[in-house]
Amino acid sequence: MVSAFYAFLDYLKNIKTASPHTLRNYCIDLNSFKTFLEKHGELTPSPPICLLTKERQEAELPFSLLTKDTVRLYILKLMQENKAKRTIKRRLSAIKSFSQYCVKQRILPDDPTETIQGPRLPKELPSPITYEQVEILMATPDLSKYTGLRDRCLLELFYSSGLRISEIVAINHWDIDFTSHLIRIRGKGKKERLVPITPHAAQWLQHYLTHPARTSIEKDAQAIFLNRFGKRLTTRSIDRKFQKYLRQSGLSGHITPHTIRHTIATHWLENGMDLKTIQALLGHSSLETTTIYTHVSMKLKKQTHNESHPHS
């Protein structure tokens, strides 16, 4: 079964063009299930599944262990360990995807996970921040430094276009059209879309790209956002910088770069943009995903009404 795990991960990477983050999560989830199956079958533990491993050793893990009962026992074990519902659901989803792949490849005659359902998750609404909080966060980077200018530009792009971190780090020079104020974005599954940027954000971007400090360290001629060594910034480094500015700004609450994406989507909706346009701008494959912002907007309106009403 281990060789099938690797074949499945290669399929996700090369055919489905899954992101490194997605592949890392699949490795974590499948390794967890593999360890359980080895203990359940009283087998000798084998090295963890890792895409970085050049030599992939087949281990003794027969497909006869992959049954409806063993998957249910695994889910029960996770629940007994008090794993979060979201973690359990994600791990079951990884096993289901693997089983479906094996059926398509005729490795398995049928899918043993087909009727198994994970725990129901409470429907959580995104928590946008206010325009004033956005402005406070924008004003935090030190513009006397080149890195501060770069980070201000990053924050402007987050709010201007509602981009994901992975989309921002992937932007190249030829993706930007300053004349029409458009950026070509490669989203999930490498699906491309054109996203407008505000003239304000475009000015910050031009200022950053022409800064002498940037041109002097540039080693990656394609990338827009560079680290201090002139190489492309990573999603992890942007997330760390975001958290640093969040601490410096004094803003409280759980705020992430994705919060800014939720925020601008909510602001677009409140200012009259229709859901289909928001869906296209955010790169949502389903309108159902975008519809959640109507609930967020109504929640905020109710809150404002209650706070402002004299009888409240």
From Swiss-Prot:
CDD domains tied to this protein: INT_XerDC_C
Subcellular location: Cytoplasm
MF-aspect GO terms: DNA binding; tyrosine-based site-specific recombinase activity
Annotated Tyr recombinase domain residues: 124-306
Presence of keyword Cell division: yes
One cellular component term from this protein's GO annotations in UniProt: cytoplasm
A GO BP entry: chromosome segregation
Catalytic center residues: R164, K188, H258, R261, H284, Y293
Source organism superkingdom: Bacteria
Keyword Ribonucleoprotein: no
Keywords linked to the UniProt accession: Cell cycle, Cell division, Chromosome partition, Cytoplasm, DNA integration, DNA recombination, DNA-binding
PANTHER family: PHAGE INTEGRASE-RELATED, TYROSINE RECOMBINASE XERC
Recorded family membership: Belongs to the 'phage' integrase family. XerC subfamily.
Protein name as catalogued: Tyrosine recombinase XerC
Organism: Chlamydia abortus (strain DSM 27085 / S26/3) (Chlamydophila abortus)
Name of the coding gene: xerC
